[in-house]
């Protein structure tokens, strides 16, 4: 299958930034790969926005830029030219764009060094940043297996979050109050 330049860029971005996910996508049916490359490249762009600068305002501007892209998709307005935004507008519709806005807004937590007040706040963050992403990627809507799907995604989200704990601490974040981060850090080595 021949991919256009934007999809190739998304695949390359994913290969560099999230090699495990890139390899997983390479195991997917060939006709689905462009869609997955674009969705998960979007996630790379969103998830790294707060970490490429120490200035919260710049991170907020980057996240707002993506919210504006999603608003353009929702409003069926021509999306600005960008190697991830342009193909994203080809692969998702209004419903998915609205869901992805929740994901982008959840990433605002990453901009600041605030801690989660309790586990329910962490669960909401994990839901908004992972379950929504996988639901959009899978093309799922509420259905017979929605709860099972959500539970599987939450397990993935929590495992990834715990593995990221050492990096979060290094970046000055407080992953969650009362969480034994030193123990988790040792287990992740």
Predicted segments, located by residue:
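Acidic catalytic motifs of isoprenoid enzymes
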Residues: 1-189
């Amino acid at each position: 299958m021949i991919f256009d330049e934007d999809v190739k860029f998304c695949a390359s971005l994913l290969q560099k930034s999230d090699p495990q996910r890139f390899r997983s996508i390479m195991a997917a049916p060939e006709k689905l790969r462009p869609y997955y490359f674009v969705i998960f490249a979007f996630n790379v762009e969103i998830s790294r926005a707060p970490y490429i600068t120490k200035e919260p305002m710049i991170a907020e501007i980057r996240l707002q830029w993506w919210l504006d892209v999603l608003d353009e998709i929702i409003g069926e307005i021509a999306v600005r030219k960008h190697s991830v935004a342009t193909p994203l507008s080809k692969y998702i519709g209004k419903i998915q764009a609205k869901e992805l806005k929740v994901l982008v807004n959840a990433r605002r937590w990453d901009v600041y060094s605030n801690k989660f007040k309790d586990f329910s706040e962490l669960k909401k963050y994990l839901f908004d940043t992972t379950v929504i992403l996988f639901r959009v990627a899978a093309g799922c809507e509420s259905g017979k297996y929605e709860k099972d799907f959500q539970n599987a995604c939450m397990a993935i989200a929590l495992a990834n979050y715990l593995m990221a704990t050492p990096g979060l601490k290094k970046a000055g974040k407080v992953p969650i109050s009362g969480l034994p981060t030193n123990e988790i850090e040792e287990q992740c080595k």
